[in-house]
């Protein structure tokens, strides 16, 4: 949250991995209506911001968000930030495996230290599910990069700001269930060797300067050994139920080139044709109350085939919507909710490019 004056406050809602369930989306829709939110922004860290709020609205939203499973604490300042994930993890064709469940566990763990650990500066953690590396996990304070065999390479002390640095590879072939040991090791390395005196040099990447690359790697690995000795098996992630089943089934499931006997390119073309047939006077309608797009409200000339993305689950698709500058017309939240509310397992994912 930041304020430049009375009535000029914004509230950032964490969405770990950019995942917005229908329940969370409904909360956003209701809050927009209840507090007359005029401006909303989806961010490069995969969160949702409400702008131009008064003090009462900010406090009310903070409290009510908890009931919807949304945490607002630590959205800014020297805290662990929203955990980033490849936006279509779990449904993306060609991904190595679904990293989202492990990222959500990491995010929950980091939220647990907010009240007890004082970091030198903010800490950004990212997970990548494929070589596309949409989250730039190799350039984060801590990044987990998926590998084809179902493990992670771990990068640390990277950053894309001033004096940008690629992260130091501190571990290879890490089992997904062990990621919390690496998260805790990062926290301890940062609090031990990070700069509390100069904010200009307080980000993790400056530890590469003070310790040297090899020195930093050694320092991190020493903390990792310390964490493993202290916690033993207690930090192992144990996924349960449907989440565990999906994670296992998704590993190595890269082939979805043929959907129910039809080439995905042909399927995309057919869907595009179907949408085109429903266009009347440049308006696409889903029901009598909801208008998805008009030429005036969404001026980009983008082919529908570029926005319809075949999932690796046969016969299912994702639809991309990219608001200019990440500024979403506030009514769009309600329109999207009305479209997906009755679709089983449908949800919204926010991408690092503000799609």
Q: Which residues are covered by each model-predicted region?
A:
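Short acidic (Asp/Glu) and glycine-rich catalytic loops that position anionic groups and cofactors
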Residues: 7, 83-85, 160-167, 195-202, ...
């Amino acid at each position: 949250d930041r304020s430049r004056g009375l009535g000029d406050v914004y509230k950032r809602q964490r969405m770990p991995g950019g995942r917005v369930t229908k329940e969370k989306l409904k909360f956003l829709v209701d809050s927009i209506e209840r507090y007359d939110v005029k401006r909303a922004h989806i961010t490069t860290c995969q969160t949702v911001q409400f702008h131009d709020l008064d003090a009462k609205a900010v406090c009310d939203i903070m409290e009510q968000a908890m009931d919807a499973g949304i945490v607002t604490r630590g959205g800014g300042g020297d805290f662990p930030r929203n955990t980033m994930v490849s936006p279509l993890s779990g449904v993306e064709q060609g991904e190595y495996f679904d990293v989202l469940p492990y990222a959500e566990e990491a995010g929950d763990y980091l939220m647990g230290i907010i009240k007890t650990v004082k970091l030198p500066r903010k800490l950004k953690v990212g997970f990548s599910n494929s070589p596309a590396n949409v989250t730039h996990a190799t350039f984060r304070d801590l990044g987990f990069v998926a590998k084809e065999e179902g493990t992670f390479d771990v990068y640390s002390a990277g950053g894309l700001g001033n004096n940008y640095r690629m992260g130091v590879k501190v571990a290879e072939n890490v089992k997904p269930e062990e990621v919390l040991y690496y998260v805790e090791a990062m926290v301890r390395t940062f609090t031990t060797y990070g700069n509390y005196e100069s904010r200009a040099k307080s980000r993790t990447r400056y530890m590469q300067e003070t310790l040297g690359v090899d020195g930093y790697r050694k320092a991190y690995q020493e903390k990792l050994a310390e964490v493993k000795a202290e916690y033993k098996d207690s930090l192992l992630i144990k996924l349960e139920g449907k989440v565990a089943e999906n994670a296992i089934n998704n590993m190595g499931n890269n082939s979805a080139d043929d959907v129910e006997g039809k080439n995905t390119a042909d399927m995309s073309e057919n869907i595009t044709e179907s949408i085109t047939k429903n266009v009347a006077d440049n308006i696409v309608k889903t029901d009598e109350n909801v208008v998805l797009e008009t030429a005036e409200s969404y001026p980009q000339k983008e082919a529908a085939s570029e926005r319809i993305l075949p999932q690796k689950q046969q016969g299912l698709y994702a639809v991309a919507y990219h608001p200019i500058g990440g500024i979403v017309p506030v009514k769009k939240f309600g329109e999207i909710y009305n479209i997906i509310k009755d679709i089983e397992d449908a949800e919204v994912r926010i991408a690092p490019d503000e799609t």
